[in-house]
Structures are given as C-alpha cells and as structure tokens.
Amino acid sequence: VCYFTAHEHLNREYICVKVDREERPDVDAVYMSVCQAMNGQGGWPLTIIMTPACRPFFSGTYLPPKARYGRVGLEELLTAVAGQWKTNRGKLLDSAGRIEAYLKEQERATVSAEPGMDLVHQAFRQFAGNFDKKNGGFGGAPKFPTPHNLMFLMEYGTREKKREALTMAEITLVQMYRGGIFDHIGGGFSRYSTDERWLVPHFEKMLYDNALLALAYVGAFGLTGRELYGGVARKILAYVGAELTDAQGGFYCGQDADSDGVEGKYYVFTPKEICRVLGENAGTAFCDRYGITEHGNFEGKSIPNLLGNEAYEEDVNAGYTKAEQAKKELTIADLQKLYEYRLQRTRLHKDDKILVSWNGWMICACAKAGAVLGETEYVDLAVRAEAFIRKNLARNGRLMVRYRDGDAAGEGKLDDYACYILALLELYRVTFQEEYLARASAWAETMIEQFFDRERGGFYLTAKDGE
C-alpha cells in the first residue's frame, strides 16, 4: 500500500527515469559523484531528484516507503520536495547551481604531483581510526565487506611490516565468515550486513562481491597458510560454480534476496526443521553449533551463524584428533543434507545477465584460487569464462557490456576493458600460455586509444567514439 501511494505521487508530480547501473555504469558514475559530493558518501539504490533542465538538487540512497528508524520515507520526501518546488523553487535551483559549480570545479582540477607513500599511510591511518576491534569491519551498521580495503591492508601490512594492518584484515575476514552474511549451508556472501556484528544480511548475493571476497580470502590464505581462509574461498567458488555459472561458461550477475515475496525466507530455519532433516541428535548438535534457536534471530527463524560459538574450527593446520576429524566430516555431511533440502524451497530469482566487467573479476578470482589452493577445477572455470567472453562479447575489436539469452548489447566501458585485461593477465600468470598475454596487450592498446585523455591524463569511462 505504501509503495502504491508513492507510485501515485511519483507519476503525478515527477517524470521518472530508471537506470540499470550494470548496463550503464557511466550514467551511474555521473550521478554517484553527485551523491558523494552532496552527502560525503554514496550507495545503491541511488535516488536523484533533478530540475527539468537535469540539474540535480537532491540525492540519497535507500528510502523506505514511510519514515522509520530515523530515516525519511519515500512518500514524505516526495510530498516535501513537490511542495518546495511549488512554493520555494528558488532555493532548490540555488542548491542545484552550487552542486553543478562544485562538480565543474572538480572536473577542472589537476594533480600537481604523483601520489606518494604519504597518501598510502594516510589511508591506513583512516582505516585504523574507523576499525571495529570487536566485530571487524569499519564503522557501524550497515556494514559492507569492502574486500578491496582488506586486500589493501594485507598488502600494506606485508610491505610496511605493519602487523596492525594484517590484524584488522584478519579479524574482519574471520568475523564475516562466522556471521550470517556468509551462507554456511550453500556458500557465498550476501551484499552487506544490516547490523554491526555481520549477523543479519541483506540476502541478495552479487557476483562482484563474491569475486573480490574470494580474492581476499585466497590472499589471506597465501599470507598465513590458515586453512580457514582457504576453506571460505573454496565455499565461495563452489557456490558460484553451482548457482551462478552458465552452461557455456560465463558467470551470472547474482541472486535476489526474496523468495515467495519474503526477504530471507530461503535462508532461515527453525530447530524443528533442522531436526526433521538431520534427525534429533544430529539436528540438536547442529542447532547448538550454528545458533538455530526457538526464538530465532530474524523474524522468528534463525540465520545459521557461528557468532555465538567460540569453539568453531579455526585452523585445521593445528591438527585434529580422530574424534574431532570425524565430527568435522559429520558437520560437512549435515551441511550437504541441508543444502539439498533447501534446494526444494522456492528458488531464488537469478539475474542471468553476463557482464564483462564482473566476469573479469571472477575469472581473476578463479585463476588465482586455482594456483594458490592447488585446485585445477577453478582454473578450468576461469578458462571457460574467458572463452565465453571472447566468443560472445568481443566484436570487431571492441568489447560489449552484457550478454543475455543469445543477445550481446552495450558499448564496452572502461571497467569492461580494465577487468577483462586483468583477467587475461591473471590467466597468463597461472597457465603461462602466451595467448593470454598477447590478448591482454592488444586490448590494453585499444583501451588506451579509446579511453585515455592524452591532454590531462587519466581515462574516460566511455570511449571517444561512443555515445
């Protein structure tokens, strides 16, 4: 009802334009810069309100139908802005003018010198000042995994011999794994946690998140040798192989959070349900281990997690007794039974677009995991996905953006070229097949020719002969 009212208001007072950020990352980038300039940060879904001349004066991220938890509601916002437009239009136009002037100034800004290590040290200090020592991650709720930040900290800690940086990354990686943001039954990570403990996720799973998280966990395994990290990476890639891989080799974008119209329904359990699948004894033990309780932790049911279990296996390299090893194998068997049971539920909708940029990240993750973990099947996944892109998303020496149901569309953007080149370089490092290096070099030349600004430096998001 709330959204119906909002729809009525939108159609009466506004002209609505919906942008698919996956197909038009260039348009998304323009308006994300507006949001970041106005609010200091951005996010999705992104809401922009503009004048008829397309000059933005409001920006925000997620808006609930009605105000709650101190957050303005969509319905109230639409009413207020429409009223201001009628009675105080000059104020809104002034706001639009200020943000436009700021963005033009930023566009003209030039860098006087190459960035140095001072900037890198500053980034580390910023992370250290914002680190959640108890739960891992940075800041409060909602919490995003930000694997790129964790990879930076691991690299910085290694190069600068800064143990604090490595500790921040490791605490975060462990706590995310223990939380409900990680799917302990089916593998893979959800987009973000609604709470600071990583317990209750927004249940949508995205390919790019899981690609970068796989890279982070593989990197942590390479640094420490702790099997926990290697095991999480394996579960991520097992999930991608089972749920997000096209029969021809490409990787799908992700899975929705809802089934039967209810967010998270696919992922939660009751103790009775667990015991019915596993039997009373095994079911009770599983519930104790994974926090499945009668009162639940999410709308009366439970998201499996290890946050309350201090005895979880953290490092198999420490060695197991025969009894402990048998218990571990039993847990794996229980997880498989629950996975097969869960498959009988109403399946989650898949976004079956295949994007060059996101596939590039996942190819990198699979190839690197194959090399570091010694699993050739992951390299095979990467090889097949690269072949899919080469066959279906490269035309006349240029890349496309996406493929779906036999149709490739969209002029490739900068991130498509950059991510695909990274994928080719990673495949070369892993396989030593020179064809990958040759293709990476050729695509890099095309990227420089089409996107590089030879006067001021830097790369444009769209090609010089693009729209």
Regions found by a protein language model. Name each.
Residues V1-A365, A369-V372:
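Replace the tail clause
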Residues T167, I171, G231, K235, ...:
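Primarily a tetratricopeptide repeat
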Residues Q175-F182, R384-R395:
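Glycine-rich, acidic and aromatic/proline-enriched surface loops and short helix-turn segments
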Residues F189, S193, G370-D380, A394-A408:
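Glycine-rich cofactor-pocket loops
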Residues A242-T245, N396-G397, V401, D405-A418, ...:
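Long, polar/charge-rich, low-hydrophobicity segments
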Residues Y267-E294, I421-Q450:
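Phosphate/diphosphate-binding loops
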